[in-house]
Structures are given as C-alpha cells and as structure tokens.
Regions:
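Charge-biased, low-complexity intrinsically disordered regions
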Residues: 48, 66-69
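Residues within the helices of the helix-turn-helix
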Residues: 61, 65
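Short Pro/Gly-enriched beta-strand edge/turn motifs at strand-loop
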Residues: 137-143
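Single, function-defining residue in the core of a domain
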Residues: 1-60, 74, 79, 84-87, ...
Length: 295
C-alpha cells in the first residue's frame, strides 16, 4: 500500500471516529453538548479541523461548500470560541494515536539505517497565542524594551521518524518545563505502541544525563546523545572509548557501560557522542553520519 492510500485510510478512520457518538462521548466535557444546541460537538470538531489563518467567514464558507450535509449554522466567533472549550483535549490525542497506529501497521516496509529504524527527539521554546486561558495556564511574560507588551511561551517537543518522515508524538508544556521530562513522555509512547524495537533514538545536547541514559538502557532503547564539551565524559574521551557509569547501593543502581566517541567536524571542532550501541562495526564515521540524520 502506498502512502497516498495510507493517508486516505487515516482520514477515513478519523471521519468514522468523530461521527461515532459512542466514541466521542468520553471527550465531551460533562454537562455540555447534551441538549439540542445550535452547535453540535461534531460541528465544532469539524470547524477546528478546517480552521486556518483565513477569516472565520472563509473557514465556514469552505465547510459549507465541502460538507453541505453538515448544515453548519450561522454563529459568532465568540460562540465558536466558547464551544471549543468544552471538547476534552484527549480527543486529539486519541486521533493522533489512531493515525500513528494506522501508518505503521499499513506501511509496506520501513526505511533502515544499517538495519535500524531512526527516531530523533527535539524541543523548542515557542511563543503561543495570547488569550486569557493561555496566560492562566502557561503564565504571562513581558520583555525589554517594551515592558507593556504581554505574551506567553511554552516548550514544544516531538519525536520524529527521520527516515519515514513521520511525527509519532508531540507535546506542549509550560515554558520552564524540562526537555528531558518531555522526552521521557515520548519514549513511553514508543513503548506503549511497540515501535521502539530495533530502533536508535538520537538526542541533541541538553538531553544527556546519567538518569536519562540509564532509562534508555533499562527500557531497551538504543540511543545516541550528544554531550556538552565541558562534562567529564567528553574531557576524558580521545577517539572511541568505553566508560562506566558507576552504580550506587544508596540509589539502587548498578554499573552501566557507556560508549563515548570524539567526532571531528569539518570546521575543525569536535563533538562528543554517548551511546549504548557497542557494535564495533558501527564506526566513528558512521556515528557522525547517524547523528547528522537528526537535522
């Protein structure tokens, strides 16, 4: 089955899901969309799917043109904004899981690097739309040179299949949230969906910590993590070495081996990578190529 047909199946499955009242019921905020209202739960969901940077009038015109049987009523922007608050965000998580499951169950073959699937984790601080609800949840910020300007920001994080060009899981968190905590959430989704076997997960600088590396080892994730130049593992590395993360009885941890590589770059600088992939057939040059897939 080609990707076009897989996408068609995903769209059809989402249509089937959102038109099934039994499946929608858990995602309705209690005491809302229960009486005969001007806007139904399905109509609000459809509007969210069709929303774009165009005006509300243009979005509604497109819905009425393409989905005339939906009988979308004339409503105000305020009414739509209020109604969307009564949809539980769990609906969109469920639709995301549905699409990921269908994609990987129907794709005829997955691309490989040296026999492995490749995933990359990354996060970014982003500015969010200004509204009372985002200010209430994410906090309100101001900045120089205009202290009167108010805005809010959050941490967006994803795990991405770099060879098959697919986002498996994404999340958004408060601005000061930990990128590592967000990454752990992605790894647990991989585990729940059974997609982490025979895979390597690539992490940028800032994700490495002994706890993070131990989690990958203990849960069967092969990983490659870029190290900061100033930490001891980087300072002690000269080429390709095996070190030991010492366990302690106090924390109930055992010794864990870690492979550290010094990779020369084209500009004359060096980067340092930590991994639990110990196969000597995977050389430094291959790790350099592997880490580049993250971009």
């Amino acid at each position: 089955m080609n990707r076009t047909n897989i996408c068609k199946n995903i769209v059809q499955s989402i249509k089937d899901y959102i038109t099934d009242q039994v499946k929608l019921e858990p995602h309705r905020v209690e005491k809302h969309f229960v009486r005969r209202r001007k806007l139904s739960l399905l109509q609000v969901i459809i509007y969210l799917f069709f929303s774009s940077k165009a005006s509300m009038f243009q979005n509604l015109s497109q819905i009425r043109e393409e989905l005339g049987t939906l009988s979308f009523p004339d409503v105000s922007k305020q009414a739509l904004s209020k109604a969307r608050q009564f949809i539980n965000p769990s609906l969109f998580k469920e639709l995301d899981y549905l699409s990921v499951d269908l994609f990987y169950s129907q794709i005829p073959s997955r691309k490989l690097w040296q026999g492995y699937h490749l995933f990359a984790v990354d996060g970014s601080r982003i500015e969010l739309p200004n509204s009372k609800s985002t200010f209430d949840f994410f906090g309100e910020m101001s900045s120089y040179p205009d202290p009167n300007r108010r805005y809010t920001m959050g941490l967006a994080s994803i795990i991405y299949d770099v060879l098959d060009d697919y986002i498996l899981h994404a999340s958004i968190h408060k601005f000061l949230s930990s990128e590592r905590a967000a990454a752990l959430e992605h790894l647990k989704v991989l585990e729940d969906m059974g997609l982490y076997n025979n895979s390597i997960i690539i992490f940028d600088r800032g994700y490495y910590s002994e706890d993070m590396f131990r989690y990958c080892v203990e849960h069967g994730h092969l990983c490659v993590m870029r190290l900061k130049e100033g930490i001891n593992l980087s300072k002690k590395c000269n080429g390709d070495m095996i070190s030991i993360l010492q366990g302690t009885s106090k924390e109930g941890t055992s010794d864990v081996p870690i492979r550290v590589l010094e990779i020369p770059l084209d500009d004359g600088t060096k980067e340092y990578l930590a991994t639990n992939l110990f196969d000597p057939a995977v050389t430094k040059d291959m790790f350099r190529e592997l880490y580049f897939y993250r971009w």
